[in-house]
From Swiss-Prot:
Name the UniProt record assigns to this protein: UPF0104 membrane protein MTH_887
Lineage top rank: taxon: Archaea
Location of the protein in the cell: Cell membrane
Membrane topology recorded in Swiss-Prot or TrEMBL: Multi-pass membrane protein
Species for this entry: Methanothermobacter thermautotrophicus (strain ATCC 29096 / DSM 1053 / JCM 10044 / NBRC 100330 / Delta H) (Methanobacterium thermoautotrophicum)
Length: 351
């Protein structure tokens, strides 16, 4: 059995290229269906009137968000290890965004960050993974506040009681799930128990396909060692008061800018959405992006936005046009930059 630390994440992407290709084919079908019902002609007409000023502002806001993201990760890395220079760290972040955006449920980004830190900077894998995981925790804290606000605001929205209940429950369940994950990450005994349980099952499963089987006793101590290193790094980053306060406000600023950016995307196509529905729908869109179904939740998020903004009185053609403006800056551009960075690091490590 080969661990993520010992194998290339690029190899993982290569080995799973069929699944990735099929996922993007599914994305194409979903987007085609949404576009068909919204009206391709109407969407194109909405896009033809796109304001270049707001389009440029969309890219500026996304660039600021990415800079803040790099600053937050660097802040955490400097607590658990020595962080590389800002430009190098930002390129590593772009590479991880590429991994996130081509794998369903954004499953490839955090291991890819840890892997590249080890290969390029010599940072131990478990420390790099702890830093990228802690980085996601800081992202979750303001999201939890926005989600609670959305759960309250949705009660004032003129929609069916069942829609209010479903969205509110979805928000609260997500908050509870993340809270449990953070608690498990900071509690060494629970983290060890979960890791050993998962490892034992994996060893049992792989033993069926390997002659002579695999000894669990042989990797037990190694699992404990890595979990302890991960737990120490994760806890250090989360419990450092200075890092926590600065990281929290950076994350809050990132979320505020992202909500503003979505608003700007609608302004770009000539629509001004009401503030309360925008915050609620933005939160639901983030929740949908967590589902490990399609890469980048392409199509799924658009479908949800079309349905929810219809309640706010905004037509599907304008919602889809705003989504295109949004995806150009938040998905296509970072993914292409990340692809170039991934190719660069791949060649560097090969040579």
């Amino acid at each position: 059995m080969v661990s993520m630390e010992e194998s290339s994440v690029f190899d993982y992407i290569r080995e799973n290229r069929r699944t990735i290709v099929l996922s993007f084919l599914a994305v194409a079908v979903v987007i085609f269906l949404i576009g068909f019902f919204a009206g391709f002609g109407d969407i194109l007409r909405a896009l033809e009137g796109t304001s270049p000023y707001f389009l440029a502002l969309n890219f500026v806001l996304e660039a600021i968000i990415l800079i803040l993201w790099t600053l937050r990760w660097r802040l955490i890395l400097n607590v658990v290890d020595d962080a590389p220079s800002f430009p190098r760290l930002m390129m590593l972040l772009f590479t991880s965004i590429f991994g996130n955006n081509i794998t369903p449920g954004a499953a490839g980004g955090e291991p890819l960050r840890a892997y590249l830190l080890r290969e390029v900077e010599g940072t131990p894998f478990e420390i790099g993974f702890a830093s990228s995981t802690a980085d996601r925790v800081f992202e979750f804290i303001p999201f939890a506040l926005i989600s609670i606000l959305s759960a309250v605001l949705i009660m004032t929205w003129e929609i069916s009681i069942w829609t209010r209940i479903v969205v509110s429950v979805l928000i609260l369940v997500t908050i509870a799930g993340f809270s449990l994950a953070v608690y498990a990450g900071m509690n060494k005994k629970i983290a060890q128990r979960i890791a050993l349980s998962v490892t034992r099952r994996l060893v049992s499963w792989f033993s069926r396909f390997r002659e002579g089987g695999i000894s669990f006793a042989g990797i037990h101590e190694k699992v404990i060692f890595y979990i302890n290193r991960f737990n120490d790094g994760f806890s250090t980053a989360i419990t450092d008061r200075r890092v926590f306060v600065i990281g929290f406000f950076i994350s809050l600023g990132m979320w505020a800018l992202d909500v503003c950016r979505l608003y700007v995307c609608f302004l770009a196509v000539g629509v001004s959405p009401p503030a309360v529905p925008l915050i609620i729908i933005y939160t639901v869109g983030i929740l949908i992006s967590l589902l490990p179904i399609l890469p980048g939740s392409l199509g799924l998020r658009e479908g949800i936005l079309v349905g929810l903004f219809a309640v706010a009185g905004i037509g599907a053609d304008y919602v889809m046009a705003a989504s295109v403006v949004d995806r150009i800056a938040s998905y296509i551009a970072p993914t292409l930059i990340g692809l170039i960075a991934a190719i660069y690091y791949g060649k560097q490590m090969t040579s």
